[in-house]
Amino acid sequence: MDNQATQRLNDLSLEPAPSHDEQDGSGLVIDIDQRKIGDEQAGVVVDDETPPLEQQDSHESLAADSRNANFSYHENQQLLENGTKQLALDEHDSHSAILEQPSHSTNCSSSNIAAMNKGHDSADHASQNSGGKPRTLSASAQHILPETLKSFAGAPVVNKQVRTSASYKMGMLADDASQQFLDDPSSELIDLYSKVAECRNLRAKYQTISVQNDDQNPKNKPGWVVYPPPPKPSYNSDTKTVVPVTNKPDAEVFDFTKCEIPGEDPDWEFTLNDDDSYVVHRSGKTDELIAQIPTLRDYYLDLEKMISISSDGPAKSFAYRRLQYLEARWNLYYLLNEYQETSVSKRNPHRDFYNVRKVDTHVHHSACMNQKHLLRFIKHKLRHSKDEKVIFRDGKLLTLDEVFRSLHLTGYDLSIDTLDMHAHKDTFHRFDKFNLKYNPIGESRLREIFLKTNNYIKGTYLADITKQVIFDLENSKYQNCEYRISVYGRSLDEWDKLASWVIDNKVISHNVRWLVQIPRLYDIYKKTGIVQSFQDICKNLFQPLFEVTKNPQSHPKLHVFLQRVIGFDSVDDESKVDRRFHRKYPKPSLWEAPQNPPYSYYLYYLYSNVASLNQWRAKRGFNTLVLRPHCGEAGDPEHLVSAYLLAHGISHGILLRKVPFVQYLYYLDQVGIAMSPLSNNALFLTYDKNPFPRYFKRGLNVSLSTDDPLQFSYTREPLIEEYSVAAQIYKLSNVDMCELARNSVLQSGWEAQIKKHWIGKDFDKSGVEGNDVVRTNVPDIRINYRYDTLSTELELVNHFANFKRTIEEK
């Protein structure tokens, strides 16, 4: 790198310049050197050692004063060092950004005042330099001098420049000092940004092919019908009056016979390809595919490329500094705008944190209740249903009373300590012990009776307690859950049994949607002889889904259930080592080894089958499914690269703190991350070390979730408990929590028409246009800051990546 390029990089260093500021009598912070200039103009003696650059005439000093009032410290220093004097003269000559003289100056001429007024009337010119180029890379940024600082500088308040509700106090990018750097960047910087753009393009390709983008999902189209219909609103926003309505629970309204079941699709068929993935083709034409899904080889080539980029030293340093900059920018924003945010929030009628919509974006269904609730339920069944036959064990049917007598327990003996389902210190870094906590009193038979959908009583008890939890959710009105429910891939009829459990027991609510979790347990099934190869699991998981997509009448209950399913999750202990025994991974039908396939292999076969399925479902007008696996909780950070390519969002993601380049990519693409600090605290990472607050400050798309209330929560409202602990430990403001609640709704899989009611009719638009503060209680100023910061980062990527394309074209 030559000396000029090095100097340009040093000029744009993110290191803060030394501060030489003091408070004046009004409490405002001003620059000492600029104050001296103002004193000199007023006739006050100035130190003879004042640098020549600061001995400016009245026009120059005023221009510098006005800018310094709105610039951050290091940008102010940078501006002075790179020719403020010449800049002010240029702007004066071109009449592009002339400000009024301070009232205390005795050398102010009437021509200068007229020029200043002309400058105020052309606000667009005021935001440009003498070359006509914008001062900030983001066209949407509104950097207007705050009224208090205008008064201090002596400039009158002009109505045309009154700050809007979405503008915020912030330093501007001094492009006069960096324009040459932007126009002639170093080759290293071009290469780094080109790699970022390449990775983003790869993700866009995989997401588009698999129809995982929100705007591709038919359920987000205007004509989609939700059945049972969502509750009628009890408030008319037009007349601002309360409307008396009576909304019945969905379980009472739902009638399976009223559900529309379409007929067979004669145009398309499905079969297995060479990679043992299901593909969809024209009937009778196996070579005419509905979509070209990336092969296993293509996927691993792309994965290796991304891993190589993310582990490159300069790329890691670059991403780390960008993330540090984002965090520092947040700290400055929060320092200057905290009270304005609070003021807007207080003026918003009716809304506060408790009555904005929030979604528990990651919670396992079998652990959706707390211990006290489960204990009361077990005691109730022992009192009222003790003679009911509940399990077939040891060659005979046992009643509930006989089961507890075999355990030498009565209802009176039961307590929270007896259940022993809470994750205490002994589960830290012991996922095997944590899994045992799903067994009440350590007995698998009680888990089978009370916490399974597929048992002798057909999951009746689990349906009953789930309805009680749902009743609490519906009463709270503003809390919603996305429950993970298991399909193991051990047999072809699992999907039909699960769908029958949901439909027959009417476990249906407008507060609940489902994700199907796939445990990575091939090695156990292989050892017990349930499956012969990995292909058996893939077949059991996906063949019923392709069958019901081709002909919904072949599995009518499954078709109705899938309308309430958002997508797939992949679960298990990530800390297990992925040993690579093959130079080239075999396809599933040839994977007969006893070892479990690696995480990346599991994820690809979930992705490839879901991609073909989604293409077909979208063509038929059915809702599509997304991939939202557990990822980055423990184990190899490379799991996060696989998920970045293939998944719509992830759960946990705490290992992103170790891979800054991948974390930067997650920020740029706003990949949804459902974080559970209380869960991490019990298993893998103590609460104080959790990266959640840093992710939030930097602008990653994070939400809070409970994971397993049965193991981690003590109250009847585990989601509120999660928020409250985070607010206390991380000192989150009310606006912060409302922003997290809004994030959770955006990440969730509810239909667009429901999200419009929850967070605003234009929620899918970018920036302030997509925010409805009346519904979200998030001030426009916060949304504008988030959008402006992200836009600037994306524009930087596009700006510098274009240089490489231009060079290659030449």
Swiss-Prot record:
Residues 1-10, 125-137 have a biased composition (Polar residues). Its EC number is 3.5.4.6. Residues 1-61, 114-137 are annotated as: Disordered. Belongs to the metallo-dependent hydrolases superfamily. Adenosine and AMP deaminases family. The gene is AMD1. This is AMP deaminase. It comes from the Eukaryota. Zn(2+) binds at residues 362, 364, 630, 707. Homotetramer. It comes from Saccharomyces cerevisiae (strain ATCC 204508 / S288c) (Baker's yeast). CDD domains: AMPD. Substrate binds at residues 364, 433-438, 633, 708-711. The modification Phosphoserine is found at residues 19, 58, 61, 138. One of its GO terms (molecular function) is AMP deaminase activity.
